[in-house]
UniProtKB/Swiss-Prot annotation:
The keyword Ribonucleoprotein does not apply. Its main location: nucleus. One of its GO terms (biological process) is auxin-activated signaling pathway. Highly expressed in etiolated seedlings. Expressed in roots. It comes from Oryza sativa subsp. japonica (Rice). Signal peptide: none annotated. This is Auxin-responsive protein IAA31. Residues 99-186 form the PB1 domain. The keyword DNA damage does not apply.
């Protein structure tokens, strides 16, 4: 009999040794379910305390953890004060050595893309990459022949949230202030300044 209890399947909580109460013979009037009598309430033990949150939950992939940790070069001895400025510049270069990814959206395109601005050396390379990325929407061979890539203006949102035309400021300043790129129809960008082809 003891062997059967070890493999018995029941609906009770694990670790409880209570016997299941037999169902009542007559259901109480006005209730949807028949409940066991009041004496059975004394047999119920208090519920176990809620478990603490598991360490490491929710899971974060290792590459995300390494991206969040700053990458700096550490030295054992303190550098002289004259080299402090050069070291801070080197730390900024190391910290900025990763990519500078921004979202790119296009009017009429059903999806967004992300690009790394540090890959491009100037506005021309950036515009060519954007045209290749959104080829089917900006007048590629598969799109309508009436659509011309020059009908679109490339704009960006800077740190202040202002919408500016790409090409109005030097490229290095553009890279440092750009938060988001948007390819909009030229007719909508007329108020921003002269469109560039």
């Amino acid at each position: 009999m003891e062997n059967l209890k070890a493999t018995e399947l029941r609906l009770g909580l694990p670790g409880t040794e209570e016997e299941a109460a037999p169902p009542p013979s007559t259901p109480r009037a006005g209730s949807k379910r028949a409940l066991a009598g009041e004496p059975d309430q004394a047999k119920i033990k208090p519920a176990a305390a809620a478990k603490a949150q598991v360490v490491g939950w929710p899971p974060v992939r290792s590459y995300r953890k390494s991206c969040l940790q700053p990458t700096t070069t550490t030295t054992k001895s303190k550098p002289p004060p004259a080299a402090a400025a050069a070291e801070t510049q080197q730390k900024e270069d190391v910290a900025g050595a990763g990519g500078l990814f921004v979202k790119v959206s296009m009017d009429g395109a059903p999806y967004l893309r992300k690009i790394d601005l540090k890959v491009y050396k100037g506005y021309r390379e950036l515009r060519e990459a954007l045209e290749a990325m959104f080829l089917c929407f900006s007048g590629g061979a598969a799109a309508d022949a009436a659509v011309n890539p020059s009908d679109f203006a490339v704009t960006y949102e800077d740190k202040d949230g202002d919408l500016m035309l790409v090409g109005d400021v030097p490229f290095e300043m553009f890279i440092s202030t750009c938060k988001r790129l948007r390819i909009m129809k030229g007719s909508e960008a007329r108020g921003l300044g002269a469109t560039r082809g």
